[in-house]
């Protein structure tokens, strides 16, 4: 929904509604601007369904953290998005992501859709596989021995990347 609002100019790159638009769908309620997605007469919950600027701001912060984390990590290991062969989306989150829309708002980097795969509940699947198969368990041990901890909060460029990502899609739009 946010991607559509952004693409159509209903919200700007800061997630604020265009107050000059001549539509009853944009209104101010309790000092917060909101957009009516569905009026209560068309819902089964006896109230309007809305999205407000606080909702959008929270989404922008969350996607900013994801984007800046990826960008910082890649930079710290001397890579860029061009080097990434695959993006794996795990958990329930991944199954609901519309790739095109996620890329429009900067939640995911703009890559070929074939590079993105959904794996569902990867932790549960991994636990089952390693419990049932010795060779998988050995691979897991091998991978864990190659892991390292990377603390984003201790990396100065993370904060710069985060601030730059607090826009739709983000300030790095090349």
Which sequence ranges carry the predicted segments?
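Helical "lid/coupling" subdomains associated with nucleotide-phosphate turnover
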Residues: 1-174
């Amino acid at each position: 929904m946010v991607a559509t609002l952004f693409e159509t100019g209903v919200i700007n790159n800061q997630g604020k509604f265009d107050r000059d638009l001549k539509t009853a769908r944009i209104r101010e309620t309790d000092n917060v601007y909101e957009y009516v997605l569905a009026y209560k007469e068309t819902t089964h919950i006896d109230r309007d369904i809305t999205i407000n600027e606080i909702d959008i701001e929270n989404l922008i912060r969350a996607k900013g953290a994801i984007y800046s984390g990826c960008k910082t990590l890649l930079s710290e290991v001397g890579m860029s998005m061009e080097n990434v062969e695959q993006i794996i989306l795990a958990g329930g989150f991944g199954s609901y992501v519309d790739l095109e829309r996620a890329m429009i708002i900067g939640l995911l980097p703009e890559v070929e859709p074939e590079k993105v795969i959904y794996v569902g509940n990867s932790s549960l699947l991994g636990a089952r596989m390693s419990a049932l198969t010795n060779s998988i368990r050995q691979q897991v041990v091998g991978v864990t021995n190659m892991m390292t901890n990377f603390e984003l909060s201790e990396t100065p460029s993370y904060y710069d990347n985060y601030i730059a990502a607090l826009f739709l899609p983000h300030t790095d739009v090349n």
